């Protein structure tokens, strides 16, 4: 998450949803921000509210980005295969299907809905990121700009990774996200 006191907004950074691009874009544009990494860089709304206090939470504009869970999990899979991950050799020994069944860590199974456990002002979608970011900038009265891309994994469209069984596994874990955010099954 990060908090910008000058423009009075809070960004809830959900993993694998372009959060690094959004956070770094504010650095590039010179916007003051305070990055909060307690207890970890990806906090739920209730954790952020506890950290920043009721007054800040109630008066600041709050936004987040969600992503189709099928696509998000493919992104996680490729991240785990990259040198950035602490155990890439472990992830590289699994096919996508095997990784879903045996290699996916519990923290990956945390739903996006869990991060957004308190109502916020705006939920954008990864699939329409620039359009939603432009709206956010307009609402907080700052000029919009093209978001840079960071940590982009190169892979085929998510649909090519999934068997019917794989889709059932992911849907079973993330059903709340599919329902709440209107993603197709």
Task: Please report, for each region that a protein language model flagged, where it lies by residue.
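Membrane-interface amphipathic segments in extracytoplasmic regions
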Residues: 1-185
């Amino acid at each position: 998450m990060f908090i910008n006191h000058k423009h009075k907004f809070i960004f809830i950074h959900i993993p694998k949803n372009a959060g690094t691009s959004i956070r770094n874009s504010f650095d590039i544009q010179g916007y003051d921000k305070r990055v909060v990494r307690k207890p970890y860089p990806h906090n739920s709304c209730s954790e952020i509210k506890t950290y920043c206090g009721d007054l800040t939470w109630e008066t600041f504009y709050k936004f987040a980005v969600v992503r189709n869970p099928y696509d998000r999990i493919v992104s996680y899979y490729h991240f785990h295969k990259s040198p950035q991950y602490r155990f890439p050799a472990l992830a590289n020994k699994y096919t996508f299907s095997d990784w879903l069944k045996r290699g996916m860590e519990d923290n990956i199974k945390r739903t996006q809905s869990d991060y957004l456990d308190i109502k916020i002002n705006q939920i954008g979608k990864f699939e329409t990121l620039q359009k939603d970011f432009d709206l956010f900038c307009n609402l907080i009265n700052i000029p919009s700009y093209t978001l840079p891309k960071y940590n982009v994994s190169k892979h085929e469209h998510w649909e090519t990774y999934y068997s019917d069984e794989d889709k059932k596994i992911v849907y079973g874990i993330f059903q709340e996200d599919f329902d709440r955010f209107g993603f197709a099954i």
